[in-house]
Amino acid sequence: MRRTGAPAQADSRGRGRARGGCPGGEATLSQPPPRGGTRGQEPQMKETIMNQEKLAKLQAQVRIGGKGTARRKKKVVHRTATADDKKLQFSLKKLGVNNISGIEEVNMFTNQGTVIHFNNPKVQASLAANTFTITGHAETKQLTEMLPSILNQLGADSLTSLRRLAEALPKQSVDGKAPLATGEDDDDEVPDLVENFDEASKNEAN
């Protein structure tokens, strides 16, 4: 037997020719396109998907309020008075304060006419730093409650308070019951006689 078909030959354009095998005389062979372009795009698509997932997670973390979000717990720091005192004492040591003994009381006068009174306080001072500290139990009292022992502590700034006090004293004496200056008591008062008892006795005798 004799072969009638001829092997296919490919030209420079990628088309093949066959002689005698097809009734038309020529046959073209098509080759699949190269896949290099699609392989390079797959990693880029994966990166974009991963970036979108990361962005969605970040948005969920940053979002405040709304349905489905977890409640944020507010951190409350409880500070005690002892901790504040320790910090204060540490700061005072840096300033080099010294204790002043023999202080029985400290009175601080306010513009409202009241007195902040400390009884037997702990007083510390640093003249170089121009710092004075008073530690103890403080009581807010009226200026009238501290009289007359506080008179020798009043300065020029307390003249207005003294004037107010002098104006308030007459009002208090008028509103309240003032004691009698003559020393007479209400129990010793004798009622006035209205009827004549001598005439009544004569009528009974007749």
Curated annotation (Swiss-Prot):
Coiled-coil region(s): none
Annotated localization: Cytoplasm; Nucleus
Keywords carried by this UniProt record: Chaperone, Cytoplasm, Methylation, Nucleus, Phosphoprotein, Protein transport, Transcription, Transcription regulation, Transport
First-listed, main subcellular location of the protein, grouped into a coarse class: cytoplasm
Record-annotated NAC-A/B domain positions: 82-147
A single cellular component GO annotation: cytoplasm
Residue positions, PTM N6-methyllysine: 46, 54
Cited SMART domains: NAC (SM01407)
Compositionally biased spans, kind Acidic residues: 183-198
Protein's UniProt keywords contain Cytoplasm: yes
Gene3D superfamilies to which the protein is assigned, alphabetical: Nascent polypeptide-associated complex domain
Modified residues (Phosphoserine): 30, 173
Region (Disordered): 1-42, 170-206
Keyword Cytoplasm: yes
GO molecular function (one): RNA binding
PANTHER family documented for this protein: TRANSCRIPTION FACTOR BTF3 FAMILY MEMBER (PTHR10351)
Job of this protein: When associated with NACA, prevents inappropriate targeting of non-secretory polypeptides to the endoplasmic reticulum (ER). Binds to nascent polypeptide chains as they emerge from the ribosome and blocks their interaction with the signal recognition particle (SRP), which normally targets nascent secretory peptides to the ER. BTF3 is also a general transcription factor that can form a stable complex with RNA polymerase II. Required for the initiation of transcription.
Subunit comment: Part of the nascent polypeptide-associated complex (NAC), which is a heterodimer of NACA and BTF3 (via NAC-A/B domains). NAC associates with ribosomes through the BTF3/NACB subunit. Both subunits can contact nascent polypeptide chains.
Protein name from the UniProt record: Transcription factor BTF3
Phylogenetic classification of the source organism: Eukaryota, Metazoa, Chordata, Craniata, Vertebrata
